[in-house]
Regions:
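S-adenosylmethionine
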Residues: 1-433
Length: 433
Protein backbone atom coordinates (compact mmCIF):
# COMPACT_ATOMS: atom_id res chain seq x y z
CA UNK A 1 0.00 0.00 0.00
CA UNK A 2 2.71 2.47 0.98
CA UNK A 3 6.08 3.12 -0.60
CA UNK A 4 8.96 1.57 1.31
CA UNK A 5 11.28 4.52 0.67
CA UNK A 6 9.99 6.92 3.27
CA UNK A 7 10.00 10.61 2.43
CA UNK A 8 8.70 11.72 5.81
CA UNK A 9 11.26 13.04 8.27
CA UNK A 10 9.37 13.66 11.51
CA UNK A 11 12.14 12.42 13.80
CA UNK A 12 14.67 12.78 16.53
CA UNK A 13 18.04 14.38 15.91
CA UNK A 14 19.70 10.97 16.36
CA UNK A 15 19.15 8.88 13.19
CA UNK A 16 17.24 5.75 14.03
CA UNK A 17 14.65 3.38 12.64
CA UNK A 18 11.24 4.01 14.18
CA UNK A 19 8.87 1.07 13.82
CA UNK A 20 5.15 1.72 13.97
CA UNK A 21 3.25 -0.19 16.65
CA UNK A 22 0.26 -1.61 14.81
CA UNK A 23 -1.48 -3.00 17.88
CA UNK A 24 -4.24 -0.40 17.60
CA UNK A 25 -4.69 -0.87 13.84
CA UNK A 26 -5.58 -4.54 13.52
CA UNK A 27 -6.50 -4.36 9.85
CA UNK A 28 -2.89 -3.83 8.82
CA UNK A 29 -0.35 -6.68 8.41
CA UNK A 30 2.71 -6.45 10.59
CA UNK A 31 5.00 -6.14 7.56
CA UNK A 32 3.32 -2.94 6.31
CA UNK A 33 3.89 0.67 7.27
CA UNK A 34 7.56 0.00 8.05
CA UNK A 35 10.70 2.02 7.36
CA UNK A 36 9.04 5.26 8.49
CA UNK A 37 10.94 8.16 9.82
CA UNK A 38 14.65 7.26 9.84
CA UNK A 39 16.79 10.27 9.02
CA UNK A 40 17.38 13.67 10.51
CA UNK A 41 15.81 16.62 8.63
CA UNK A 42 18.44 17.49 6.04
CA UNK A 43 20.66 20.49 6.39
CA UNK A 44 19.16 23.61 4.83
CA UNK A 45 22.39 25.13 3.54
CA UNK A 46 25.97 23.99 3.09
CA UNK A 47 28.51 25.90 5.11
CA UNK A 48 31.17 27.81 3.21
CA UNK A 49 34.65 27.14 4.57
CA UNK A 50 37.24 29.83 3.89
CA UNK A 51 40.76 28.77 3.03
CA UNK A 52 43.36 28.44 5.78
CA UNK A 53 45.05 31.78 5.16
CA UNK A 54 41.77 33.67 5.06
CA UNK A 55 40.12 32.06 8.08
CA UNK A 56 42.96 32.97 10.45
CA UNK A 57 42.29 36.68 10.12
CA UNK A 58 38.68 36.85 8.95
CA UNK A 59 37.10 40.17 9.81
CA UNK A 60 33.43 40.23 8.72
CA UNK A 61 33.36 44.02 8.98
CA UNK A 62 35.55 44.30 5.90
CA UNK A 63 33.23 42.29 3.64
CA UNK A 64 31.40 44.04 0.84
CA UNK A 65 27.79 42.96 1.33
CA UNK A 66 25.42 44.28 -1.32
CA UNK A 67 23.49 41.20 -2.46
CA UNK A 68 21.62 38.30 -0.85
CA UNK A 69 24.33 35.91 -1.96
CA UNK A 70 26.97 38.02 -0.25
CA UNK A 71 24.87 38.08 2.91
CA UNK A 72 24.53 34.30 2.83
CA UNK A 73 28.26 33.93 2.33
CA UNK A 74 29.09 36.14 5.31
CA UNK A 75 26.57 34.31 7.50
CA UNK A 76 28.19 30.99 6.58
CA UNK A 77 31.71 32.30 7.18
CA UNK A 78 30.75 33.66 10.59
CA UNK A 79 29.17 30.30 11.44
CA UNK A 80 32.43 28.63 10.48
CA UNK A 81 34.43 30.91 12.77
CA UNK A 82 32.03 30.53 15.70
CA UNK A 83 32.01 26.73 15.39
CA UNK A 84 35.65 26.71 16.53
CA UNK A 85 36.21 30.22 17.73
CA UNK A 86 39.58 29.67 19.35
CA UNK A 87 41.08 28.34 16.13
CA UNK A 88 39.29 30.45 13.52
CA UNK A 89 38.78 33.88 15.07
CA UNK A 90 40.51 37.07 14.13
CA UNK A 91 42.65 37.76 17.23
CA UNK A 92 41.58 41.40 17.20
CA UNK A 93 37.84 40.61 17.38
CA UNK A 94 35.79 39.24 20.26
CA UNK A 95 32.96 36.74 19.92
CA UNK A 96 30.22 39.39 20.49
CA UNK A 97 31.34 41.21 17.32
CA UNK A 98 30.80 38.14 15.17
CA UNK A 99 27.45 37.35 16.82
CA UNK A 100 26.12 40.87 16.42
CA UNK A 101 27.01 40.94 12.72
CA UNK A 102 25.46 37.50 12.29
CA UNK A 103 22.22 38.66 13.91
CA UNK A 104 22.02 41.78 11.75
CA UNK A 105 22.72 39.79 8.58
CA UNK A 106 20.01 37.25 9.42
CA UNK A 107 17.54 40.04 10.15
CA UNK A 108 18.32 41.66 6.81
CA UNK A 109 18.35 38.47 4.73
CA UNK A 110 15.26 36.83 6.24
CA UNK A 111 13.37 39.99 7.26
CA UNK A 112 13.28 39.48 11.03
CA UNK A 113 12.69 42.13 13.64
CA UNK A 114 15.54 42.70 16.08
CA UNK A 115 13.59 41.50 19.15
CA UNK A 116 12.45 38.27 17.50
CA UNK A 117 15.97 37.53 16.30
CA UNK A 118 17.41 38.21 19.75
CA UNK A 119 14.87 35.87 21.41
CA UNK A 120 15.72 33.06 19.01
CA UNK A 121 19.46 33.68 19.14
CA UNK A 122 19.35 33.59 22.93
CA UNK A 123 17.55 30.25 22.86
CA UNK A 124 19.54 28.43 20.20
CA UNK A 125 22.98 29.99 20.02
CA UNK A 126 24.41 31.27 16.71
CA UNK A 127 24.73 28.06 14.69
CA UNK A 128 21.35 26.54 15.52
CA UNK A 129 19.71 29.97 15.29
CA UNK A 130 20.61 30.09 11.60
CA UNK A 131 19.41 26.51 11.08
CA UNK A 132 16.06 27.34 12.69
CA UNK A 133 15.62 30.49 10.61
CA UNK A 134 16.47 28.66 7.39
CA UNK A 135 14.03 25.86 8.26
CA UNK A 136 11.27 28.42 8.80
CA UNK A 137 11.65 29.42 5.15
CA UNK A 138 10.45 25.94 4.17
CA UNK A 139 6.87 24.71 4.32
CA UNK A 140 6.29 21.69 6.52
CA UNK A 141 4.81 18.52 4.96
CA UNK A 142 1.01 18.43 4.64
CA UNK A 143 -0.52 16.02 7.14
CA UNK A 144 -4.09 14.86 7.69
CA UNK A 145 -5.63 12.96 10.57
CA UNK A 146 -7.93 10.08 9.72
CA UNK A 147 -11.25 10.12 11.59
CA UNK A 148 -11.31 6.59 12.98
CA UNK A 149 -14.87 7.16 14.18
CA UNK A 150 -15.80 6.67 10.51
CA UNK A 151 -13.08 4.56 8.89
CA UNK A 152 -9.60 3.14 9.36
CA UNK A 153 -6.40 4.81 8.22
CA UNK A 154 -5.69 2.07 5.68
CA UNK A 155 -9.13 2.56 4.12
CA UNK A 156 -8.62 6.31 3.88
CA UNK A 157 -5.18 5.83 2.33
CA UNK A 158 -6.65 3.54 -0.33
CA UNK A 159 -9.33 6.11 -1.18
CA UNK A 160 -6.80 8.93 -1.55
CA UNK A 161 -4.35 6.80 -3.54
CA UNK A 162 -7.18 5.94 -5.94
CA UNK A 163 -7.65 9.70 -6.42
CA UNK A 164 -3.99 10.08 -7.40
CA UNK A 165 -2.57 11.12 -4.03
CA UNK A 166 0.83 10.00 -2.80
CA UNK A 167 0.51 9.28 0.91
CA UNK A 168 2.55 7.85 3.74
CA UNK A 169 1.77 7.16 7.42
CA UNK A 170 3.16 9.24 10.26
CA UNK A 171 5.02 6.70 12.37
CA UNK A 172 4.26 8.10 15.81
CA UNK A 173 0.52 8.69 15.27
CA UNK A 174 -1.65 5.75 14.22
CA UNK A 175 -4.26 8.05 12.68
CA UNK A 176 -2.13 10.45 10.61
CA UNK A 177 -1.00 10.47 6.99
CA UNK A 178 1.45 12.69 5.14
CA UNK A 179 0.31 13.87 1.72
CA UNK A 180 3.19 14.41 -0.70
CA UNK A 181 1.24 14.84 -3.91
CA UNK A 182 -2.44 15.08 -4.71
CA UNK A 183 -4.34 15.60 -7.95
CA UNK A 184 -7.33 16.94 -6.01
CA UNK A 185 -7.53 19.68 -3.34
CA UNK A 186 -7.22 17.84 -0.03
CA UNK A 187 -9.47 20.35 1.71
CA UNK A 188 -12.32 20.00 -0.80
CA UNK A 189 -12.84 16.30 -1.46
CA UNK A 190 -16.14 14.49 -0.79
CA UNK A 191 -14.29 12.51 1.87
CA UNK A 192 -13.25 15.72 3.60
CA UNK A 193 -16.83 17.00 3.54
CA UNK A 194 -18.04 13.70 5.01
CA UNK A 195 -15.61 14.04 7.90
CA UNK A 196 -13.32 11.18 6.97
CA UNK A 197 -10.27 13.31 7.79
CA UNK A 198 -9.11 16.76 8.79
CA UNK A 199 -5.93 18.57 7.66
CA UNK A 200 -3.81 19.07 10.77
CA UNK A 201 -0.18 20.04 11.33
CA UNK A 202 1.83 17.09 12.57
CA UNK A 203 2.97 19.02 15.65
CA UNK A 204 -0.62 19.73 16.69
CA UNK A 205 -1.21 15.99 17.07
CA UNK A 206 1.32 15.85 19.91
CA UNK A 207 -0.63 17.53 22.77
CA UNK A 208 -3.59 15.17 22.44
CA UNK A 209 -1.30 12.14 22.25
CA UNK A 210 0.33 13.34 25.48
CA UNK A 211 -3.05 13.98 27.15
CA UNK A 212 -4.13 10.35 26.46
CA UNK A 213 -7.92 10.81 26.53
CA UNK A 214 -9.88 7.71 27.55
CA UNK A 215 -13.47 6.62 26.90
CA UNK A 216 -16.17 7.76 29.36
CA UNK A 217 -14.08 10.56 30.86
CA UNK A 218 -14.98 14.20 31.39
CA UNK A 219 -12.50 16.30 29.44
CA UNK A 220 -12.10 20.02 28.71
CA UNK A 221 -10.47 21.59 25.68
CA UNK A 222 -9.88 25.04 27.11
CA UNK A 223 -8.92 27.04 23.98
CA UNK A 224 -10.31 24.88 21.22
CA UNK A 225 -10.96 26.72 17.94
CA UNK A 226 -10.83 25.70 15.15
CA UNK A 227 -11.31 22.23 16.61
CA UNK A 228 -8.58 19.98 15.26
CA UNK A 229 -7.45 18.91 18.72
CA UNK A 230 -11.04 18.70 20.02
CA UNK A 231 -12.04 16.26 17.29
CA UNK A 232 -8.87 14.27 18.00
CA UNK A 233 -9.81 14.05 21.69
CA UNK A 234 -13.34 12.94 20.79
CA UNK A 235 -11.91 10.30 18.49
CA UNK A 236 -9.73 8.83 21.26
CA UNK A 237 -12.70 8.95 23.65
CA UNK A 238 -14.60 6.90 21.05
CA UNK A 239 -17.43 9.44 21.20
CA UNK A 240 -18.21 8.52 24.82
CA UNK A 241 -18.09 10.52 28.03
CA UNK A 242 -18.35 14.30 27.89
CA UNK A 243 -16.05 16.69 26.04
CA UNK A 244 -16.49 20.36 26.90
CA UNK A 245 -15.13 22.46 24.06
CA UNK A 246 -14.45 26.10 24.91
CA UNK A 247 -13.19 29.11 23.02
CA UNK A 248 -13.20 32.68 24.25
CA UNK A 249 -13.66 34.16 20.76
CA UNK A 250 -17.33 34.13 19.77
CA UNK A 251 -16.42 34.68 16.12
CA UNK A 252 -14.61 31.32 16.04
CA UNK A 253 -17.43 29.29 17.58
CA UNK A 254 -19.22 28.68 14.28
CA UNK A 255 -16.18 27.10 12.61
CA UNK A 256 -15.56 25.08 15.77
CA UNK A 257 -19.10 23.73 15.75
CA UNK A 258 -18.88 23.03 12.03
CA UNK A 259 -15.76 20.88 12.43
CA UNK A 260 -17.22 18.97 15.36
CA UNK A 261 -20.39 18.26 13.40
CA UNK A 262 -18.57 17.28 10.20
CA UNK A 263 -16.32 14.88 12.11
CA UNK A 264 -19.29 13.29 13.92
CA UNK A 265 -18.32 14.35 17.45
CA UNK A 266 -21.56 13.81 19.36
CA UNK A 267 -20.16 13.77 22.89
CA UNK A 268 -19.15 17.44 22.68
CA UNK A 269 -20.68 20.55 24.22
CA UNK A 270 -19.44 23.89 22.87
CA UNK A 271 -19.18 26.83 25.27
CA UNK A 272 -17.94 30.40 24.93
CA UNK A 273 -16.17 31.72 28.04
CA UNK A 274 -12.94 33.54 28.74
CA UNK A 275 -10.65 30.71 29.77
CA UNK A 276 -10.11 32.03 33.28
CA UNK A 277 -13.90 32.23 33.85
CA UNK A 278 -14.98 28.71 32.85
CA UNK A 279 -17.60 27.75 35.50
CA UNK A 280 -17.47 23.95 35.16
CA UNK A 281 -15.22 21.74 37.29
CA UNK A 282 -14.20 18.16 38.10
CA UNK A 283 -12.57 17.31 34.78
CA UNK A 284 -10.46 14.16 34.48
CA UNK A 285 -8.16 15.73 31.87
CA UNK A 286 -7.75 19.20 30.40
CA UNK A 287 -6.02 20.35 27.25
CA UNK A 288 -4.70 23.90 27.35
CA UNK A 289 -3.23 24.71 23.96
CA UNK A 290 -2.52 28.22 25.14
CA UNK A 291 -2.61 31.41 23.09
CA UNK A 292 0.98 32.38 22.31
CA UNK A 293 3.25 34.51 20.14
CA UNK A 294 3.48 31.83 17.44
CA UNK A 295 7.29 31.82 17.43
CA UNK A 296 7.21 28.17 16.38
CA UNK A 297 4.99 28.56 13.32
CA UNK A 298 6.84 31.23 11.37
CA UNK A 299 6.68 29.15 8.19
CA UNK A 300 2.86 29.44 8.38
CA UNK A 301 2.73 33.10 9.35
CA UNK A 302 5.67 35.22 8.22
CA UNK A 303 4.24 38.23 10.06
CA UNK A 304 5.57 36.74 13.29
CA UNK A 305 9.07 37.70 12.14
CA UNK A 306 8.40 41.38 12.69
CA UNK A 307 5.22 41.83 14.75
CA UNK A 308 6.52 40.32 18.00
CA UNK A 309 8.73 41.95 20.60
CA UNK A 310 9.75 41.39 24.21
CA UNK A 311 6.70 43.23 25.55
CA UNK A 312 4.50 40.72 23.71
CA UNK A 313 6.27 37.92 25.57
CA UNK A 314 5.56 39.53 28.93
CA UNK A 315 1.88 40.10 28.11
CA UNK A 316 1.41 36.60 26.74
CA UNK A 317 3.19 35.05 29.71
CA UNK A 318 0.71 36.62 32.12
CA UNK A 319 -2.24 35.26 30.11
CA UNK A 320 -0.66 31.80 29.97
CA UNK A 321 0.07 31.70 33.70
CA UNK A 322 -3.50 32.64 34.51
CA UNK A 323 -5.00 30.05 32.15
CA UNK A 324 -2.76 27.24 33.38
CA UNK A 325 -3.55 28.12 36.98
CA UNK A 326 -7.28 28.01 36.19
CA UNK A 327 -6.95 24.70 34.35
CA UNK A 328 -5.43 23.08 37.44
CA UNK A 329 -8.25 24.51 39.57
CA UNK A 330 -10.81 22.78 37.32
CA UNK A 331 -9.42 19.25 37.71
CA UNK A 332 -11.14 16.49 39.65
CA UNK A 333 -8.77 15.84 42.55
CA UNK A 334 -9.86 12.29 43.39
CA UNK A 335 -7.67 9.19 43.26
CA UNK A 336 -9.79 7.76 40.46
CA UNK A 337 -9.20 10.72 38.16
CA UNK A 338 -6.24 11.18 35.83
CA UNK A 339 -5.91 14.74 37.21
CA UNK A 340 -3.77 15.92 34.30
CA UNK A 341 -3.43 19.11 32.30
CA UNK A 342 -1.54 19.09 29.02
CA UNK A 343 -0.04 22.54 28.50
CA UNK A 344 1.15 23.28 24.97
CA UNK A 345 2.06 26.22 22.77
CA UNK A 346 3.19 26.72 19.19
CA UNK A 347 6.01 28.92 20.44
CA UNK A 348 9.64 28.00 21.09
CA UNK A 349 10.32 30.82 23.56
CA UNK A 350 11.31 29.80 27.09
CA UNK A 351 9.25 32.64 28.55
CA UNK A 352 6.03 31.09 27.24
CA UNK A 353 6.88 27.49 28.06
CA UNK A 354 9.24 26.35 30.82
CA UNK A 355 8.98 29.69 32.61
CA UNK A 356 5.17 29.54 32.70
CA UNK A 357 5.06 25.95 33.95
CA UNK A 358 7.81 26.63 36.49
CA UNK A 359 5.99 29.64 37.94
CA UNK A 360 2.66 27.84 38.32
CA UNK A 361 4.10 24.68 39.86
CA UNK A 362 6.29 26.54 42.36
CA UNK A 363 3.57 29.01 43.35
CA UNK A 364 0.77 26.44 43.69
CA UNK A 365 2.67 23.59 45.33
CA UNK A 366 -0.06 21.04 44.52
CA UNK A 367 1.09 19.68 41.15
CA UNK A 368 4.06 18.14 39.38
CA UNK A 369 5.36 17.46 35.86
CA UNK A 370 4.98 13.90 34.60
CA UNK A 371 6.22 12.09 31.50
CA UNK A 372 4.37 12.95 28.28
CA UNK A 373 4.92 9.47 26.89
CA UNK A 374 6.04 11.01 23.60
CA UNK A 375 8.99 9.16 22.09
CA UNK A 376 10.11 12.04 19.89
CA UNK A 377 11.16 15.58 20.74
CA UNK A 378 13.96 17.19 22.74
CA UNK A 379 13.65 17.33 26.53
CA UNK A 380 12.43 20.55 28.11
CA UNK A 381 15.12 22.84 29.48
CA UNK A 382 16.23 22.25 33.08
CA UNK A 383 17.65 25.75 33.24
CA UNK A 384 17.92 28.82 31.04
CA UNK A 385 20.54 31.45 31.69
CA UNK A 386 20.37 32.18 35.44
CA UNK A 387 16.98 30.52 35.97
CA UNK A 388 16.81 26.99 37.39
CA UNK A 389 13.45 25.34 36.65
CA UNK A 390 11.46 23.01 38.87
CA UNK A 391 12.23 19.26 39.00
CA UNK A 392 10.88 17.23 36.09
CA UNK A 393 11.00 19.97 33.47
CA UNK A 394 13.10 17.68 31.27
CA UNK A 395 10.02 15.43 30.99
CA UNK A 396 8.35 18.07 28.83
CA UNK A 397 9.07 18.06 25.10
CA UNK A 398 10.31 20.62 22.58
CA UNK A 399 9.91 20.31 18.81
CA UNK A 400 11.74 22.28 16.14
CA UNK A 401 11.36 22.54 12.35
CA UNK A 402 15.09 22.16 11.71
CA UNK A 403 15.31 19.02 13.86
CA UNK A 404 11.97 17.21 13.65
CA UNK A 405 10.51 18.71 10.45
CA UNK A 406 7.37 19.87 12.27
CA UNK A 407 6.27 23.29 13.45
CA UNK A 408 7.91 24.56 16.62
CA UNK A 409 5.97 23.26 19.63
CA UNK A 410 6.15 22.73 23.38
CA UNK A 411 4.25 20.01 25.25
CA UNK A 412 4.16 19.51 29.03
CA UNK A 413 1.98 17.16 31.08
CA UNK A 414 1.14 18.26 34.63
CA UNK A 415 -0.56 16.15 37.30
CA UNK A 416 -2.39 17.48 40.32
CA UNK A 417 -1.43 15.83 43.62
CA UNK A 418 -4.14 14.13 45.69
CA UNK A 419 -4.83 15.65 49.10
CA UNK A 420 -2.53 18.65 48.62
CA UNK A 421 -4.06 22.12 48.70
CA UNK A 422 -2.98 24.96 46.47
CA UNK A 423 -0.96 27.51 48.46
CA UNK A 424 -2.98 30.48 47.26
CA UNK A 425 -5.41 31.83 44.71
CA UNK A 426 -4.02 33.33 41.53
CA UNK A 427 -2.91 36.90 42.11
CA UNK A 428 -2.81 36.56 45.91
CA UNK A 429 0.40 36.62 47.91
CA UNK A 430 1.75 33.30 49.15
CA UNK A 431 1.43 32.89 52.90
CA UNK A 432 4.77 31.08 53.20
CA UNK A 433 6.74 33.95 51.68
Amino acid sequence: LFSKSSKTKFIEEQPQKIQLDLSSDESQPQDQLQEMVNEVAEEYEEMVEPDQAEQAAYDPRTDVVETHDQLKQRISRIQYVLANFKEHRNPNLGRPVYIEILKKDVCQLYQYGADTAEILLGLFGPEEFVQFVQACEQQRPLTIRCNTLKLKRKELAQILIAKGAEVEPVSWCHDALTIFKSQVPIGATPEYMRGFYIPQDAASLLPVLALKPQPNEKILDMAAAPGGKSTHICQLMKNTGVLIVNDSNAERIQSLQSNLSRMGCFNSIVINYPGHNIPFTNFNRILLDAPCTGLGVISKDQRVKTNRDKSDLRKMQEIQRRLLWKALDLLDNSNESARTVCYSTCSVSVAENEAVVDYVIKERGDCKIIDTGLTVGRPGLKRFREQQFCPGMELSKRFYPHVHNVQGFFVCLIMKKVGVKCKREYGAKREDK
